[in-house]
């Protein structure tokens, strides 16, 4: 196989869509698998809709996903004169022409076709009227440059996913190459840039299939070899309809804020339309080793499954090193608190127990608040009701037990509290409920036998002793 060069070419007119992220991932993995190049091109020729904010967001999202590109970022706007020059070459060779038909005139033709229930393919009266068009151009009449599309025969796309796709050339219109303001259109710019960048394979959504037919016709007119085409089915919502905001988060930045890990999101997107045997968990490194376009599925759209996405994220959280998770959690909590070194150390120590119960980083950070010494505990309704029903004297005895332990570790705490529950003729769970409520403000938490040694005697006793204040304030929620 020749040296592979792929590209991802987003327009900075919005945030990176989850479908765009999958497209970028597939292009990246295919290039890396074949030891080729993966390039990033920002298609910023739509000045009215392109913004710096969106550009930065797209770049940041790709970096977060660890989809790293080769070479410098290519900006389409930097190549405008090259695009226009190619259009002028096509005019010179008789494969494009100056068109003076106004948008209003075209709209009238379109409305007439609709009235007559006919499909509308614009064929300009200037298509073969070269002498008159040159005369009008020289008189500064407004014009566009249109491609002289073939008007007979077929254009065939041999697509790696869609198979052979045949377009009747009569259905390909004379697309605009250069607008009346002198700027090139997307359809021209993308062909010129892909050629100049040496792109060998284009992997993108199958909503670009019609564009592909027009682009291949343009490649033929220019005498250039077209890249291999790989049009993948789009991502649909769980209900089988086109993905939209009503399905929930669709931007990569939203998933990052929700607490997804990039490794989990990439793993999930990888399996949307590509598979390797029955493997579900595929690391970044293994994906590079395995990925090829032969593994891309059929023509049916992939559906988002939020439950599976959440499951995968939970798996990756539990598989991630505690120190890495602690750093991420501390970063989240630092937006709310000025954390002391002691709190950071407690979060690090407690991470094993915390991560076993979390599927999102945001949940993990919320659960880690039990180790944030700079914040007062927030008690849920059920925890307060348990505390109100618990005799203060029982907790006073627990405080004495904790205070008298020579060594504070999981085993010593478990043994001491188990023996105490027996002397009180209580089930161990009955004793753990109020202790958990006082130490964590919740009815669910990591093992209390783990929480107590991590908090240490001073902080454990301080929280347990708070029972009197809670009961005297009658902090019961109904």
Swiss-Prot record:
Domain of life: Bacteria
CDD domains hit by this protein: GluRS_core
Signal peptide extent: none
GO cellular component: cytosol
Compartment(s) of residence: Cytoplasm
Catalytic activity: tRNA(Glu) + L-glutamate + ATP = L-glutamyl-tRNA(Glu) + AMP + diphosphate
Motif placement: 'KMSKS' region: 242-246
Record keywords: Aminoacyl-tRNA synthetase, ATP-binding, Cytoplasm, Ligase, Nucleotide-binding, Protein biosynthesis
Sequence motif 'HIGH' region, residues: 10-20
Listed InterPro entries: aa-tRNA-synth_I_cd-bd (IPR045462), aa-tRNA-synth_I_codon-bd_sub2 (IPR020751), aa-tRNA-synth_I_CS (IPR001412), aa_tRNA-synth_I_cd-bd_sf (IPR008925), Glu-tRNA-ligase_bac/mito (IPR004527), Glu/Gln-tRNA-synth (IPR000924), Glu/Gln-tRNA-synth_Ib_cat-dom (IPR020058), GluQ/Sye (IPR049940)
Main location: cytoplasm
Family: Belongs to the class-I aminoacyl-tRNA synthetase family. Glutamate--tRNA ligase type 1 subfamily.
Binding partners and assembly: Monomer.
Described purpose of this protein according to its UniProt entry: Catalyzes the attachment of glutamate to tRNA(Glu) in a two-step reaction: glutamate is first activated by ATP to form Glu-AMP and then transferred to the acceptor end of tRNA(Glu).
Record-given protein name: Glutamate--tRNA ligase 1
Source taxonomy: Bacteria, Pseudomonadati, Pseudomonadota, Alphaproteobacteria, Rickettsiales
